[in-house]
Every structure is written in structure tokens, then in C-alpha cells.
Amino acid sequence: ADNLPEDDPKFDGVLQIIREKQKSENNKIILFSTFRYTLYYIKRKLREAGFRVEQIDGSVKNDDRLDFRARFELPKDDPEAIDIMLFTEVGSEGLDYQFCDMMINYDLPWNPMRIEQRIGRIDRRGQGNEVVNIYNIITSDTVDADIYDRCLSRIGVFEGSIGECEEILGEIGRQIELIALDTSLTDAVSYTHLRAHET
């Protein structure tokens, strides 16, 4: 993460979203990345920008997880409050955050059901907000962008209840994982295989 360039348009876009949200009374944001070291980088950059941020991944002890969650729920004017929580998939397990109404997916996992699990951290019974905002940060002209544009957007995964799409998403997820895990395929061949799964 220390070797990442300081000129980072992807992070700059996320920072703009975060700054806008911090103007709200409910300023809480959950941000996911598949990679722990990406979160270290984001945490450093956000702290440099003056935000109160913590990270939960598989290496964080349970007592610390519970403490971070309690501080994340505090109102924004509390000096002990956390504004932004950063998670890996493993880090988010077992704790729900219905009081938070914004999630940022800094990157997207290959398996679409993991996206549902991420969303499930905040979109649970007891969510007091009428609208939950989910931002998916996808760099254009990448295989990831093509996967999600073609496979997930077409079935409206972010337009309604994820549960209704579970069967379709599961099959697409299996197809994507098979292609993604086949190390013998070049990017061009992977792209061709992914296009073949369009309906």
C-alpha cells in the first residue's frame, strides 16, 4: 500500500463521496475492500484528510471489533465517535450496522453473493432509513468493470431486494468464479468467455 501512487483518481472520487456525506447528520459510512492492504492505504489517506476511521479485518480482536462498533454508533458530535468503518469480508462477519445508511464498495468480489453479504451488514430489519446508498467504485476499461456491467447490472442486483435474485446471482457467480480462477486464460480469453455468458 505504501507503494501506491499519490495521484489516485479512484481514491479521490471516494473522498468526494465521503466529504459530501460528512455534511449529513448521519455521517456514518462503511467501506469494503477485498484486500487488507488496500484498507491500510485508505485508512492512512482518510486520517490524513482528518476523518475518524477504523479498520476491521480478520486480524482484529473481538474486543476491539465490539469497541469500534460501539464508537461507530455514537453521534457525530461525540469526540469518541468513528465516522468511517473499513472492512474486509471476514472483518464484517457477525456484526450488523442498521444505523448506517451508506456503503462504498471500493472493489467488488468475484462472487456476487459476497456483495449481498456486504449489503446485508446495513440493509437489515431495523434499518431506520428509507434509502440506503451503495456506491460501487469500478475502474472503467477493466475486466472487473465488464463483469459487473454485463452480469450484475442486467439483472438489477442493486435495484431491489437482493434476495429475489439469489438463484440467478448464484449461477452467475459460479460462472464468473470458474473463469476468474482459470489461470490458463489470458485477459482477452477471459473477456470472451464472460461475453458468452450474456443473455
Predicted regions and their residues:
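Conserved Helicase C-terminal RecA-like lobe
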Residues: 1-84
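Conserved SF2 helicase motif VI
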Residues: 113-127
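A short beta-strand element within the Helicase C-terminal
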Residues: 96-107, 133
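Conserved nucleotide-binding/hydrolysis micro-motifs of P-loop NTPases
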Residues: 36-38, 60-62, 91-93, 109-111, ...
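Hydrophobic heptad-repeat coiled-coil signature
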Residues: 90, 196-198
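C-terminal accessory region of SF2 helicases/translocases
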Residues: 127-195
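SF2 helicase motor core recognition
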Residues: 86-100, 120
